[in-house]
Amino acid sequence: LRIGVIQVPAFYRDFRAESEGSRDFTSTTRDVRRLISELEGKRIDGLVIDLRGNGGGSLTEATSLTGLFIDEGPVVQVKDALGKVEVEVDPDPGVVYSGPLAVLVDRNSASASEIFAGAIQDYGRGIIIGEPTFGKGTVQTLIDLNRYVAGDGEDLGRLRLTMAEFFRVSGGSTQLKGVEPDILLPTAEYLADHGERSLDNPLPWDSIRPARYTKVSLVDMQGLLEGSRERVARDPGFQMLIASERI
């Protein structure tokens, strides 16, 4: 099998260049689209999007990147402090890549990474592999206190305010729980002291009404899970982790 792997370190977009009218501004979606075209020219049998260590970035890019793999529909729901819900929708109807898809995640995959992985999982478009993700399902803004308080020149710092929450199209939040992988890759380290769940007074997990979307269900999840269990059962390293109650 020929498997293409695209590592996505962040969800970036050059908003300044875009606002200045540049036609070739950089963005995650544009770069991934180009790489997919190159990989399909090499006749790949499947594609892996590697989001391990990706702490997030642009919501716009998380939405548009998801759109490369689904035809159309909602990608994520955003609920503000007043309870108003806005649905972010795939901005570009059509599919750039329709073949087998896997998404690699780990404990440091956060925010926009969780939006992308959660949408791919909800649509049944691909399989999520790795560790439970970071669990950051909130939106913050930074307020520069120096702009509002007259001082003697001393830097008063900045205040970070939570202003909204992310919810998957299936209705559940990514807060605290993150995205649970379809196939868990065992780790020798505990996850309880990592991510939002390790912070003092984090916002609790919540859910809202699911958005209207149509599942693609291109994955034989049952067959993949059975194959994974068989490989784990045969692997001495996995069995050692199981015996030590690490997984």
Model-derived regions, located:
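Conserved functional hotspot residues or short segments at active or partner-binding sites
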Residues: 169-247
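A broadly tuned preference for mixed-charge, low-complexity surface segments
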Residues: 96-108, 154-171, 213-229
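Polar, glycine-rich mid-to-C-terminal structural blocks
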Residues: 124, 129-196
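Generic structural signal for residues positioned in beta-strands
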Residues: 5, 74, 100, 158-162, ...
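Cleft-lining beta-strand/loop regions that shape enzyme active-site pockets
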Residues: 1-150, 165
